[in-house]
């Protein structure tokens, strides 16, 4: 999904996206060919613009207060093949080609905790790689 900066400046897009009072919009990343839901993150206008221009997922890290270019420290990138808005314009769906794992815990998906009928939580997927292997000896805090 490589786009020109002209697309990022499209008035229709900015009118359609409903950012929160904090200037953010929730984003779901989904593997384009399998339908697997990989993660949920946030974008601000700058992150959305960068994603559109580069074709690579860029999010807003609320904990760090800065842009988070997916894979910049781990190499686990997301190539954006399509971007969709929901019917209200308040959630974005990215159809991506995920390189490696999406979760900072080393799992393919961030959705690895399954909640049972009585509220018990079962971990349904093991890490494919350690956070230390992804981010170095210091590990990684949640984006």
From Swiss-Prot:
Key words, A-Z: Amino-acid biosynthesis, Cytoplasm, Histidine biosynthesis, Hydrolase, Magnesium, Metal-binding, Zinc
Binding of Zn(2+), residues: 87, 103, 110
Primary location class: cytoplasm
Top-level EC class: hydrolase
Keyword Hydrolase found: yes
Complex formation: Homodimer.
Name listed for the protein in its UniProt record: Phosphoribosyl-AMP cyclohydrolase
Name of the coding gene: hisI
